[in-house]
């Protein structure tokens, strides 16, 4: 899967290809442009280990939900477009109090129409938790009662029918890919018998035993090592998500050993951030110094022992504290999550520093940088001094939202962009700026050059770009640069009396010229068409980034 396919749904790629075809019909005087098959970093470049990174996304804090499950007046800030790269599973966690369903509906509409297709285009699976006791056990009992039967009379067909009902209600209705059994109880044998059968019935449709193991997912999510509800159906699940909030890697080691006979290394421990309004729990997972934090310990343990991955709960609360933040909703730069992704995936410190400097270099092309509280030079200095991944990322992002060079820098995404060579384009931008600034006189050629340069800068300072887009911007700039060198016009009288031959040759062999400039109008048209096409591709990709 190419990088562009992760960024944009198929319909965007088709639209771009259609625009390219239309432009080619109008003129052939331009270079190949961005398309869905761009040569660019693959998913393997971004996340090559096969380990998972899951985030719990609290739906009631999405920008589309207002006043749901909250008594705080603050506006929500996060959307699913903010989910960092390197995440491959999003667990949608939602509680909608009775009477607030109408206020919550915009999120579920957006999820199905926009969020899910976008995240799918990035290779991300979407799952939703269902309560073990409420759905996997008592839900089935209620289902049987509605048919005037007891649980002891249940047949495989009954379990299959109930499983389809659960999948339709919790998964298909909102465009998701799987379910997560949230087990935080100690069920008795009768309950386990029911849940075993419900889980087996669900596994016919989702997860590793289904007919679609690559496009669906079935998870078991728990906070302990009570194995009775799990051991008989372990093969039905993709992995175990283990809530070890407030605990170091010592607990990871013990719990992973408990589950290893049943699930192997497909064990995914998780940590949490402080939730607003929680006046009781104090987990302190994300605390400096970084290398003493639970985040560093668990991410390192996952990497070193090749476990199934890692997860974080309450993505939007990344970086929050147990003081004033318990009573407010404020934006986050997602520093801890982005670092945990890189740490658990084994990103080398040198790679992290190269990615950070790459980002600073390309963002410095902007004449005005809107969101920086620190200069690029200061950030570069801090990157150079950084001793670990956290310090490297913090050098660019800052310790909290609004404190760094950028609020949105994504180290995993940037590491993927390192595979696209932008050096030639950067040289062309420098050369163009030199020519544009050489004198104040404006001309058609300079206007075209400015347009091409600004489009290239706009593209390179976006969130993401492809190799084909870089090629398009580069070739448009080359055409514009060439157009600033006038084509010599032969004298009106030829010394050898060959005026007619020269004129005829000029008419037949030279492109049309702009009056009094000697600049090819074909080149100017080519620059405009190339930039128009590259610009469309850019605007579409930005819309979804």
Curated annotation (Swiss-Prot):
Instruction: List the transmembrane segments.
Output: 518-538
Induction of this protein: by what? Answer: Constitutively expressed. Is up-regulated when cells are grown on lactose (by comparison with cells grown on glucose), or when the bacterium is incubated with human or bovine lactoferrin.
Task: Describe, from the UniProt record, how activity changes with temperature.
Answer: Optimum temperature is 30-45 degrees Celsius. Is heat-resistant, since the enzymatic activity is not significantly impaired by incubation at 95 degrees Celsius for 1 or 5 minutes.
Q: Where is this region: Disordered?
A: 486-511
Q: GH18 domain: which residues? A: 51-333
Check the record and name the Pfam families matching this protein: TIM-barrel_EndoS
Biotech use? EndoBI-1 might prove useful as a novel tool for diverse applications in proteomics and glycoproteomics research.
Q: Name one GO molecular function term.
A: mannosyl-glycoprotein endo-beta-N-acetylglucosaminidase activity
The superkingdom of the source organism is Bacteria
Q: How does activity depend on pH?
A: Optimum pH is 5.0.
Q: Where in the cell is it found?
A: Cell membrane
Topology term for the membrane: Single-pass membrane protein
Q: Which GO terms describe its biological process?
A: carbohydrate metabolic process; protein deglycosylation involved in glycoprotein catabolic process
Keyword match Metal-binding: no
Major location category of this protein: membrane
Report whether Membrane shows up as a keyword of the record. Answer: yes
- Keyword annotations: Carbohydrate metabolism, Cell membrane, Glycosidase, Hydrolase, Membrane, Signal, Transmembrane, Transmembrane helix
Q: Which residues form the signal peptide?
A: 1-36
**Record InterPro entries:** EndoS_F2-like_TIM-barrel, Glyco_hydro18_cat, Glyco_hydro_18_chit_AS, Glycoside_hydrolase_SF
State a GO cellular component annotated for this protein: plasma membrane
**EC number per UniProt:** 3.2.1.96
Give the main EC class. hydrolase
Q: What family name appears in the similarity comment?
A: Belongs to the glycosyl hydrolase 18 family.
Q: What is this protein called?
A: Endo-beta-N-acetylglucosaminidase
In its UniProt entry, the species of origin is given as: Bifidobacterium longum subsp. infantis (strain ATCC 15697 / DSM 20088 / JCM 1222 / NCTC 11817 / S12)
């Amino acid at each position: 899967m190419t990088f562009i396919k992760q960024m944009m749904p198929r319909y965007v790629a088709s639209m771009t290809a259609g625009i390219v075809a239309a432009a080619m019909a109008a003129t052939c005087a331009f270079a190949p442009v961005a398309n869905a098959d761009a040569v660019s970093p693959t998913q393997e470049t971004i996340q090559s280990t096969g380990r998972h990174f899951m985030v719990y996304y609290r739906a009631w804090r999405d920008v589309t939900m207002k006043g749901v499950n909250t008594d705080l007046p603050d506006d929500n800030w996060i959307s699913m477009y903010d989910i960092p790269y390197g995440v491959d599973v999003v667990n949608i966690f939602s509680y909608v109090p009775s009477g607030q369903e109408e206020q919550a509906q915009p999120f579920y509409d957006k999820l199905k129409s926009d969020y899910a297709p976008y995240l799918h285009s990035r290779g991300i699976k979407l799952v939703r938790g269902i309560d073990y006791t409420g759905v996997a056990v008592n839900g089935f009992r209620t289902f049987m009662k509605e048919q005037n039967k007891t649980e002891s009379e249940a047949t495989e067909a009954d379990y299959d029918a109930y499983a389809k009902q659960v999948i339709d209600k919790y998964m298909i209705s909102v465009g998701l890919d799987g379910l997560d059994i949230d087990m935080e109880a100690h069920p008795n044998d009768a309950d386990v018998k029911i849940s075993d059968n419900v889980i087996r019935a669900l596994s016919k449709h989702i997860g590793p035993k289904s007919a679609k193991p690559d496009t669906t997912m079935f998870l078991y999510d728990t906070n302990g090592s009570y194995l009775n509800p799990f051991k008989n159906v372990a093969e039905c699940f993709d992995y175990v998500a283990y809530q070890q909030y407030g605990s170091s890697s010592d607990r990871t080691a013990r719990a992973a050993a408990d589950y290893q006979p049943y699930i192997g290394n497909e064990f995914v421990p998780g940590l949490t951030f402080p939730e607003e309004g929680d006046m009781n729990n104090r987990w302190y997972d994300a605390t400096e110094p970084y290398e003493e934090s639970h985040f560093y310990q668990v991410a390192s343990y996952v990497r070193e022992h090749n476990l199934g991955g890692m997860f974080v709960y309450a993505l939007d609360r990344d970086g929050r504290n147990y003081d004033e933040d318990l009573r407010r909703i404020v934006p986050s730069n997602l520093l801890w999550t982005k670092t945990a992704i890189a740490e658990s995936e084994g990103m080398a410190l040198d790679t992290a520093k190269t990615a950070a400097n790459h980002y600073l270099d390309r963002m410095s092309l902007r004449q005005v940088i809107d969101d920086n509280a620190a200069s690029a030079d200061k950030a570069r200095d801090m990157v150079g001094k950084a001793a670990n991944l956290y310090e490297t990322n913090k050098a660019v992002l800052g310790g909290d939202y609004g404190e760094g060079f950028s609020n949105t820098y994504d180290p995993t995404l940037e590491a993927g962009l390192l595979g696209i060579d932008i050096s030639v384009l950067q040289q062309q931008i420098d050369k163009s700026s030199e020519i544009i600034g050489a004198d104040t006189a404006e001309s058609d050629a300079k206007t075209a050059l400015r347009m091409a340069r600004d489009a290239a800068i706009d593209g390179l300072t976006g969130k993401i770009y492809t190799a084909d887009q870089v090629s398009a911007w580069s070739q448009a700039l080359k055409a514009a640069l060439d157009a600033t060198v006038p084509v010599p016009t032969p004298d009106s009288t030829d010394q050898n009396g060959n005026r007619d031959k020269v004129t005829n040759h000029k008419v037949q062999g030279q492109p049309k010229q702009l009056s009094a400039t000697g600049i090819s109008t074909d080149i100017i048209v080519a620059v405009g068409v190339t930039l128009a096409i590259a610009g469309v591709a850019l605007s579409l990709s930005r819309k979804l980034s």
